[in-house]
Amino acid sequence: MKFTKIFTGLLLAMMLFVTPAQAQRSQSADDPSGFVVLGEFIPDIIQEIRYYTTYNFVGEKIDGYEMPCALMTIEAAEALKKVSDDVMKMGYRLKIFDAYRPQMGVDHFMRWAANVNDTRMKKYFYPKIAKDRIIPEGYVAVKSGHSRGSTVDLTLFDMKTGKDVDMGGTFDYFGEKSHPDYKKITKTQYKNRMILRNVMIKHGFKPLAEEWWHFTLKDEPYPDTYFTFPVKLLQK
């Protein structure tokens, strides 16, 4: 009887102590019910959804981007709202380039990368990278963390100047210059990168070593699900 009571107590304690990783959920890849529209959830953000336009490394509107809006999981959006509140106090707003990316968009990237003759945007986004090296060097891949819904590409917008903060490099540039710790930039540019990086880390996001603009919620709710629904306003 004593052993039974001890075992029951341990079991109850284990049930009560659930880590974020243990709280991960499974969901159908075509089900957007765990997502929100960032512009509605965080009204202060600015959205410049590059893959809805032709100004991106592919040079054409990307499959799956039906509207120029950003979507994220509820958990990631809640964390990003805290980031937004913090940077607003510093005189900045968040500018979003991309968030949730449907798998069909990733597939579009792969088709483009396989066509080595299409280099129309090379001088803007990958001037120092041969087109046939884009896949081997990992600039695009068959799966993207963006498709799990808790990754965001963003920068800071200075409310005083009315311009993007100078990060010493541009969004989606393929090369060492995009690494957060790249040394051949000014102290001010590096400081700006660190302002963004530190506030994102503070609120539960982890950075990427190759891209200063890229962050993923550390305790993302769907770490194994690559969603397929298109980017558009969600039905309420």
Segments predicted by a language model, with ranges:
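Positively charged n-region of N-terminal signal peptides that target proteins for export
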Residues: 1-6
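Bacterial N-terminal signal peptides
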Residues: 8-18
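Extracytoplasmic cell-surface/polysaccharide-interacting catalytic and binding patches
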Residues: 22-99, 106-107, 111-210, 220-236
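Conserved metal-phosphate-binding beta-hairpin within the catalytic cores
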Residues: 215
